[in-house]
């Protein structure tokens, strides 16, 4: 985990992916925090009771997607945050970057939830050695076709194991 900038809000230029002179590239994975982020806690995943339950862990955005979403949808969150961090993933992250990957994820880890809606078994993914999931770029079509993905607002990932 690398602190990119502290108290960066005052340097935020609207409608740009450049913050305080630092350009957030599409390859970077970033998250913001109200307080200094000092330690990662592993999170035990559970099989969700319904599709809208996302995995638990440290969430990050791919490129400037999360920051851009916050600007328009939750500007208060952005205003309250003072720290921007870059995440480096070295471990076993399940990566979804296209329709074929998406179908494979649903085939391998999808299960029928209540009312016939499909969920993803985050617990099984963890048991099989994955320390997180990343879906980049964002897939708008899948959002409307897959109930479990509907709550994901941007290209993002979630890490639940510190070795990742």
Predicted regions and their residues:
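Short acidic, low-complexity intrinsically disordered linear motifs used
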Residues: 1-16
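Generic detector of well-ordered alpha-helical segments enriched in charged/polar residues
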Residues: 5, 9, 67-71, 103
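Glycine-centered flexibility motif
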Residues: 6, 57, 129-132
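Active-site and NAD+-binding cores of ADP-ribose-processing enzymes
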Residues: 19-47, 74-164
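Extended catalytic/binding region for NAD+/ADP-ribose chemistry, centered on the ART fold
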Residues: 44-80
């Amino acid at each position: 985990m690398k602190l990119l900038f502290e108290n960066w809000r005052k340097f935020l230029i609207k409608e740009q992916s450049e913050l305080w002179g630092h350009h957030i590239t599409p390859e970077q994975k970033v998250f913001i925090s109200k307080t200094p982020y000092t330690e990662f806690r592993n999170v035990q995943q559970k099989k969700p009771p319904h599709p809208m339950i996302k995995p638990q862990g440290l969430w990050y955005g791919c490129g400037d997607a999360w920051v851009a979403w916050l600007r328009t949808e939750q500007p208060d969150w952005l205003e309250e945050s003072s720290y921007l961090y870059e995440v480096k993933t070295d471990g076993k992250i399940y990566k979804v970057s296209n329709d074929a990957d998406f179908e494979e994820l649903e085939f391998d880890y999808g299960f029928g939830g209540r009312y016939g809606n499909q969920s993803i078994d985050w617990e099984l993914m963890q048991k099989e050695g994955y320390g997180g999931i990343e879906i980049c770029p964002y897939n708008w079509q899948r959002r409307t076709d897959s109930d479990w993905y509907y709550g994901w607002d941007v290209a993002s990932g979630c890490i639940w194991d510190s070795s990742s």
